[in-house]
C-alpha cells in the first residue's frame, strides 16, 4: 500500500508496525510511537513514563516516604530510572536500586528488602514488571499491609491488583504530539 500511495511521512505505532514498515522498505521518513525500547533511531514518543511524574505523585500521596526501593532487570542504565535518583535526592529521599538477572534472584532481593523495610519505605515496580509475578506481587502487598509500606507501579495493570497508583498515557495528547513530530520531520526534509 505504501508503494502505491507514496506517503510523505509514515507513523508507526508499536514494534509490530515498525517491523511491517521496515519490511515494506518504506521510501518515506518514519515517526515512531508507542514503543518501550530506546534502541530505535527514529523520532517519536516512547511509552515509558517520566520518572519525575511518577515520583512527584508518590511524594504527594505519601509525603513521609524517605526511601524508594526498586528492582531493575539486569545491569546498566534503565531509561525508566533516568533522573530518578537526583529528583528524589533533591527532596531528601533515597533511591535504592538493586539489580536482578532472573526471577529467583529478584524474589530473594524482594524478600530481603521487605524484611528490612518500614513505614518510611516504598517499593516501585517498573513498567516491565521487574520480575514481579503473582507470588511476588502478593508478597509485596502483604508487606504493604503489615508494615504500612507504599507499593506503586509504572504499569497501570498493577493498580487493579492492589498497587497504590500507576500512571498511564494520555493517548489524545500523544497522538497530537506525534502529528507535530511528523510535521517537523516534513519541514526539515523540505528545508535546504
Each language-model region and where it sits:
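Short hydrophobic alpha-helices and adjacent helix-cap/hinge residues
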Residues: 1-192
Amino acid at each position: 500500500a505504501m508503494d502505491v500511495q507514496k506517503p510523505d511521512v509514515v507513523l508507526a505505532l508499536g514494534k509490530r508496525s515498525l517491523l511491517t514498515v521496515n519490511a515494506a522498505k518504506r521510501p518515506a521518513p518514519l515517526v515512531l510511537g508507542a514503543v518501550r525500547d530506546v534502541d530505535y533511531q527514529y523520532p517519536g514518543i516512547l511509552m515509558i513514563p517520566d520518572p519525575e511524574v511518577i515520583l512527584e505523585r508518590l511524594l504527594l500521596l505519601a509525603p513521609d516516604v524517605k526511601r524508594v526501593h526498586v528492582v531493575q532487570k539486569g545491569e546498566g542504565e534503565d531509561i525508566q530510572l533516568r533522573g530518578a535518583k537526583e529528583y528524589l535526592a533533591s527532596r531528601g529521599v533515597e533511591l535504592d536500586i538493586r539489580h536482578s538477572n532472573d526471577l529467583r534472584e529478584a524474589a530473594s532481593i524482594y524478600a530481603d528488602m521487605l524484611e528490612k523495610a518500614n513505614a518510611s519505605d516504598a517499593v516501585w515496580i517498573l513498567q516491565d514488571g521487574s520480575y514481579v509475578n503473582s507470588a511476588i506481587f502478593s508478597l509485596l502487598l502483604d508487606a504493604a499491609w503489615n508494615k504500612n509500606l507504599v507499593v506503586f507501579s509504572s504499569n497501570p495493570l498493577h493498580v487493579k491488583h492492589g498497587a497504590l497508583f500507576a500512571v498511564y498515557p494520555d493517548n489524545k495528547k500523544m497522538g497530537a504530539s506525534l502529528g507535530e513530530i511528523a510535521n517537523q520531520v516534513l519541514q526539515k526534509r523540505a528545508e535546504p
